């Protein structure tokens, strides 16, 4: 039986060490045959690095690795292209100077592997020199692959001045790709975020963005069909409805996909856990929610237009865009009005909804994880037993536990939405189905909570502190 490729990001290692591989090479063949410059944005831990590594092996002519895969009979293995593989995934870039040092080291590593000595000292010129020399010495055009193209910026997103300086350095680097067009066979850039072309790719305006192209929706991630076809040796006893509820649901305008990191760890451990969520901290996102005073129930009703979808930048980061790009929200549906497309966002699955709301709840209440969990357990027990006296008492205790200073600092504390956000996050973090602003023929319900075969309707009212009853 083959091994689960947990944490494997190198295609050659995956194949040679007998790991499972979900064959994405039909899409790779199509990309190579129909275009030249590509960009793909996907959330972290979604298989982007493995995709880049697979492209590198294909263009390098490593035919033996593709035995039994689609590409074996749909690729010209007689031609080997020189490949420049750049990855900013290792370590943190702490300044524009470090960015230059890191990039120079990667260029020199590639040059050394092809026995080339670079003479240019300026980084952009050195990059251009490497591309030209590789073309000349190998008599084949060059393939440029850039992984985690945006990580140096995202690592410093809370320091706008530094992030902008790093962005300018990257723009100078990426502009070389367009200027080197006569020497380039294929270029592919991946990252988490989609920075606007004006800010980062002004010199590379021929980049084809396939992030929301339905044809390539499953280029990264696993479809339900792929899981059942490839991992059949590890599927005994798997409840596919629960697997989908927990880890499926990412919609890039094609077939919905699972997060591969979640699937592999679940198949290994057979426990439904927040595997993907625990690999990163949403601290910057939580900070933005707090600063902008967003209401948490509104997260499932966010609407974003195409302009906002492509306007992610250091100076202007819309929360809707941030939630989508980082994988905490996904596309629920698309609506066209007056020739414009509008994207309705929602949580992709139970893991993300429960985990994110758990973080949000701790921030909303300014309480520790243990305190919040204790209150959640009491509320859950009260709901499951339909014990309304206990439910009321549990709610009173939950709000009483919030520090007074936190109330005074929070501008939303005088509004119903603040309390609705706390209760929404409390139940959503438990994995319950919670519907905010549920529309009925009698009006709108503030909050609807579904548990087993019970439906709980909750309304919120904030009374004037001077009034004793209302």
Question: Which ranges hold each PLM region?
Answer:
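Phosphate-binding site recognition
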Residues: 1-415, 430, 452
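Structural signature of nuclease core domains in nucleic-acid processing machines
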Residues: 388-470
């Amino acid at each position: 039986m083959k091994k689960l490729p947990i944490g494997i990001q190198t295609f050659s290692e995956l194949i040679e060490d007998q790991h499972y591989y979900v064959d994405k090479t039909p899409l790779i063949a199509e990309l190579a045959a129909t275009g030249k410059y590509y960009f793909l944005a996907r959330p972290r831990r979604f298989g982007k690095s493995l995709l880049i590594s697979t492209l590198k092996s294909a263009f390098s002519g490593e035919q033996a690795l593709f035995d039994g895969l689609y590409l074996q009979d749909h690729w010209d293995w007689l031609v080997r292209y020189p490949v420049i593989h750049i990855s900013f995934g290792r370590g943190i870039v702490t300044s524009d100077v470090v960015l230059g040092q890191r990039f120079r080291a990667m260029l020199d590593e590639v040059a050394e592997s092809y026995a080339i000595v670079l003479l240019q000292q300026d980084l952009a010129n050195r990059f251009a020199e490497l591309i030209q020399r590789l073309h000349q010495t190998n008599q084949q055009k060059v393939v440029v692959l850039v992984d985690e193209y945006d990580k140096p910026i995202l690592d410093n997103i809370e320091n706008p001045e530094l992030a902008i300086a790093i962005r300018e350095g990257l723009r100078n680097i990426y502009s070389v790709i367009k200027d080197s067009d006569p020497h380039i066979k294929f270029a592919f850039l991946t990252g988490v975020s989609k920075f606007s072309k004006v800010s980062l790719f002004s010199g590379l305006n021929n980049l084809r963005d396939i992030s929301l192209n339905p044809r390539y929706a499953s280029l990264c991630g696993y479809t339900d069909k792929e899981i059942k076809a490839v991992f059949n040796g590890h599927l005994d006893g798997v409840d596919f409805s629960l697997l989908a509820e927990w880890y499926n649901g990412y919609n890039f305008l094609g077939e919905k996909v699972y997060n591969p990191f979640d699937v592999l760890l679940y198949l290994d451990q057979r426990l439904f856990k927040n595997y993907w969520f625990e690999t990163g901290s949403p601290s910057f996102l939580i900070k933005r929610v707090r600063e902008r005073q967003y209401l948490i129930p509104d997260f499932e009703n966010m609407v974003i237009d195409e302009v906002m979808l492509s306007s992610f930048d250091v100076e202007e980061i819309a929360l809707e865009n941030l939630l989508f790009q980082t994988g905490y929200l996904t596309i629920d549906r698309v609506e066209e009005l007056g020739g414009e497309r509008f994207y309705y966002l929602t949580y992709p699955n139970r893991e993300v909804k429960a985990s994110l709301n758990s973080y949000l709840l701790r921030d909303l209440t300014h309480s520790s994880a243990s305190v919040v969990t204790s209150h959640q357990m009491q509320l859950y027990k009260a709901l499951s037993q339909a014990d309304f006296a206990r439910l009321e008492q549990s709610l009173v205790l939950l709000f009483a536990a919030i520090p007074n200073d936190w109330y005074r600092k929070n501008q939303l504390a005088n509004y119903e939405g603040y309390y609705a956000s706390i209760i929404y996050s409390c139940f959503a973090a438990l994995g319950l189905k919670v519907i905010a602003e549920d529309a009925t023929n009698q009006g709108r319900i503030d909050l609807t909570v579904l548990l087993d075969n019970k439906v709980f309707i909750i309304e919120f009212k904030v009374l004037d502190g001077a009034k004793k009853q209302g």
